[in-house]
């Protein structure tokens, strides 16, 4: 009944039924304005993969008058936030290579009151009850390590770049004409709205989302090379002043070796690394345990086998002795 929409959806989902359901759940969240789920949507993928059509459909579902475009800087600034009040959908198109802690984004999606400072009027505090949809070629890089952003972030990746000759310039108009059918389908499919919510939550820690985050955040990628042991008999935390470096014994040394091997300069301090570790491990479904010993903090973590081939210095390196 909505051939253009289904064709777009099938390509965006790579023909996978479970991915189709996640995209539909995201559209339902916009339609029903479920800002109270405290999630924000981030659609990533190469140019021409159908991301902008996703934003167009979301705008149609929210209603053109209820949607606005902004940048992530708008969300972070009390002066600029004034422009966002009164909308139920906030689109963030192409936040190219943005990096920051996302405090405003976290507060708005978390349902916290944020300060708004309009020109020529007194500042005040308010809630912004809107669903946020970011559309990016490259995923945003959040420096927040508390888990406040990752707990709310739903990444949906559109991997396939549609060849220019296959693109339909009339696609948006065709889908606009199918809107009534799309709305009816979403309302029927998610007559229990919690089904949509649980689909989005399961997407948060899906392999797809983890891989996108690994590509965007080197520290998060390093955590993917760790596995847990049944007891705290694994690597010690270590610190930067222990010489010579022992990459197999000390976790922090292994992290520094990973960053160096991959040419990353902005390493986390030991303190920030230690604070972020349990939160990032949790995203991989792993539990962090540690104990204090005479040799320092010992953890339940060890390096996976693939670390040795991918980036760990070889044994004949004198620094590993």
Question: PLM ranges: what are they?
Answer:
Residues 59, 67-68, 176-221:
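Phosphate-handling catalytic cores of nucleic-acid transaction enzymes
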Residues 62-77, 99-102, 118-123, 129-130, ...:
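Positively charged interface segments
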Residues 19-23, 51-54, 101, 179, ...:
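Hydrophobic (often cysteine-bearing) scaffold residues that line and stabilize catalytic clefts
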Residues 54-57, 83, 87, 101-108, ...:
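Alpha-helical scaffold elements adjacent to nucleotide-binding pockets in ATP/GTP-utilizing enzyme cores
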Residues 88-91, 132-136:
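Conserved two-lobed SF2 helicase motor
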Residues 21-25, 39-42, 118-121, 186, ...:
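Short coil/turn segments at secondary-structure boundaries
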């Amino acid at each position: 009944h909505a051939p253009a929409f289904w064709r777009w959806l099938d390509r965006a989902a790579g023909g996978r039924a479970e991915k189709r359901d996640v995209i539909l759940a995201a559209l339902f969240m916009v339609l029903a304005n479920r800002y109270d789920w405290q999630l924000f949507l981030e659609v990533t993928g190469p140019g021409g993969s159908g991301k902008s059509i996703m934003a167009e459909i979301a705008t149609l579902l929210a209603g053109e008058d209820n949607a606005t475009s902004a940048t992530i800087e708008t969300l972070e600034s009390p002066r600029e936030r004034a422009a966002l009040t009164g909308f139920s959908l906030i689109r963030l198109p192409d936040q190219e290579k943005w990096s920051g802690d996302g405090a405003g984004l976290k507060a708005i999606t978390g349902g916290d009151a944020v300060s708004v400072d309009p020109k020529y009027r007194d500042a005040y505090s308010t809630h912004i009850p809107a669903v946020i949809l970011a559309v990016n070629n490259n995923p945003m890089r959040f420096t927040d390590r508390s888990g406040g952003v990752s707990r709310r972030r739903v990444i949906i990746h559109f991997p396939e770049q549609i060849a220019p000759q296959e693109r339909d310039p009339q696609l948006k108009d065709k889908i606009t004409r199918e809107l009534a059918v799309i709305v009816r389908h979403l309302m029927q499919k998610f007559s229990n709205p919690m089904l949509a919510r649980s689909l989005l939550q399961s997407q948060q820690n899906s392999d797809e989302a983890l891989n996108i985050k690994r590509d965007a955040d080197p520290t998060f990628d390093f955590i993917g090379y760790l596995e847990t042991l049944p007891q705290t008999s694994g690597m010690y935390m270590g610190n930067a002043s222990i010489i010579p470096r022992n990459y197999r014994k000390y976790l922090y040394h292994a992290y520094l070796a990973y960053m160096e091997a991959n040419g990353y300069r902005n390493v986390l301090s030991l303190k920030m690394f230690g604070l972020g570790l349990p939160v990032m491990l949790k995203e991989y479904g792993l539990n962090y345990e540690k104990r204090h010993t005479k040799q320092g903090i010992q953890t339940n973590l060890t390096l996976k086998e693939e670390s040795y081939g991918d980036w760990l210095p070889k044994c004949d390196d004198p620094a590993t002795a």
